[in-house]
Amino acid sequence: MSLDIVILAAGQGTRMRSALPKVLHPVAGNSMLGHVIHSARQLQPQGIHVVIGHGAELVRERLAADDLNFVMQDKQLGTGHAVAQALPALTADTVLVLYGDVPLIEVETLQRLLAKANDQQLGLLTVTLDDPTGYGRIVRDEQGKVTAIVEHKDANDAQKAIKEGNTGILALPAARLADWMGRLSNNNAQGEYYLTDVIAMAVADGLVVATEQPHDAMEVQGANDRRQLSELERHYQLREGRRLMAQGVTLRDPARFDVRGEVSVGRDVLIDINVILEGKVVIEDDVQIGPNCVIKNTTLRKGAVVKANSHLEGAVMGEGSDAGPFARLRPGSVLDAKAHVGNFVELKNAHLGEGAKAGHLTYLGDAEIGARTNIGAGTITCNYDGANKFKTVMGEDVFIGSNNSLVAPVEIKAGATTAAGSTITQAVEAGDLAVARARQRNISGWKRPEKIKKS
């Protein structure tokens, strides 16, 4: 069975009170539409067709990709009208209709729905709610077969009492779709062309409407305002927390933990409160992450420890290495096994060899640091001349004294030592001691200046 997916993303979202198109509002660091597209791709369709309208150019700009076909809906005349705009591009056997503001839909739910769709049967995703206000109601006959969907504004009192609501997500036989679209009418309270009207048409044409439901009603929850958006965010985070805990992660408090990307984890991982994981994060076995950390596009090898209030981006921490508290590892930072980065240390494009240490109050940029080298407090690499970046290289077993300025390009070879307070501008040979500071001079009998008293 070949598959085309149509994603409806043309709505304005006036209740968001925003210049940003509704479908671009983020959930967990990705736009709502981005989440839907991600789920759609996992179904491996032959085409993904995104119907856009309000803010169309911005939506195209943010989400442009070779596998997406953007279809313009100039006037928002209803869901049926939106799907009709994509008709010329649909060539598969089955068409799945999704919504750009329903970001939590699970791929497994969609797979179950698609399994019920064929040339003689529609797949319709419904949801049973205690309060289905706003949802179209699923009307069934005495045998329990679906006969129609009635929109809330068009429903009578008996129909409004029905608890089963329409999610709008359905799988249709493509061969029938053009005929049904041509028969749609806007004779309703909204004056719109409802996609849901194809259900009654399908029944009249002798097709069966097979229903499926999500395991969790939040899967089909949309966001029309910022309160609903925040509810989606919190539900997504709790869902991700449950997923990670099932894989062997201890979360001190799943309600105070955020995932904003793709996270893979090992076993016996400990994550404290207020940790944010962004982008692609790999966490191996026995890793510990302290409170209030932000970790983005980073790999943490087995047994690595990230202490409180640290910020890591584009970094790799080797096995048994540690960073923090208050450490900042910027893109290109690599710590080999058992390397140590302490409090108020910043690394950028720096590689610390096995067992190397930078304990505190240090900036290391564009640096290659050998195994077991020790960097004294207050040391900085002077790597930028206002136009170009230069590299600092330190061999193995180097000892850098406190409060050093290492003016790149410069090399300090294996086993060398630099004295505290030095400004190193030239190469230091292996095993040498470099002293690059003014000699101390004491002035006897010196008196401090006195403040002039105001008259």
From Swiss-Prot:
The active site is at H360. Residues 248-455 are annotated as: N-acetyltransferase. Pfam families: Hexapep, Hexapep_2, NTP_transf_3. Pathway: Nucleotide-sugar biosynthesis; UDP-N-acetyl-alpha-D-glucosamine biosynthesis; N-acetyl-alpha-D-glucosamine 1-phosphate from alpha-D-glucosamine 6-phosphate (route II): step 2/2; Nucleotide-sugar biosynthesis; UDP-N-acetyl-alpha-D-glucosamine biosynthesis; UDP-N-acetyl-alpha-D-glucosamine from N-acetyl-alpha-D-glucosamine 1-phosphate: step 1/1; Bacterial outer membrane biogenesis; LPS lipid A biosynthesis. GO terms for biological process: cell morphogenesis; cell wall organization; lipid A biosynthetic process; peptidoglycan biosynthetic process; regulation of cell shape; UDP-N-acetylglucosamine biosynthetic process. It catalyses: alpha-D-glucosamine 1-phosphate + acetyl-CoA = N-acetyl-alpha-D-glucosamine 1-phosphate + CoA + H(+); N-acetyl-alpha-D-glucosamine 1-phosphate + UTP + H(+) = UDP-N-acetyl-alpha-D-glucosamine + diphosphate. Mg(2+) binds at D101, N224. Homotrimer. In the N-terminal section; belongs to the N-acetylglucosamine-1-phosphate uridyltransferase family. In the C-terminal section; belongs to the transferase hexapeptide repeat family. This is Bifunctional protein GlmU. It comes from Pseudomonas putida (strain ATCC 47054 / DSM 6125 / CFBP 8728 / NCIMB 11950 / KT2440). The gene is glmU.
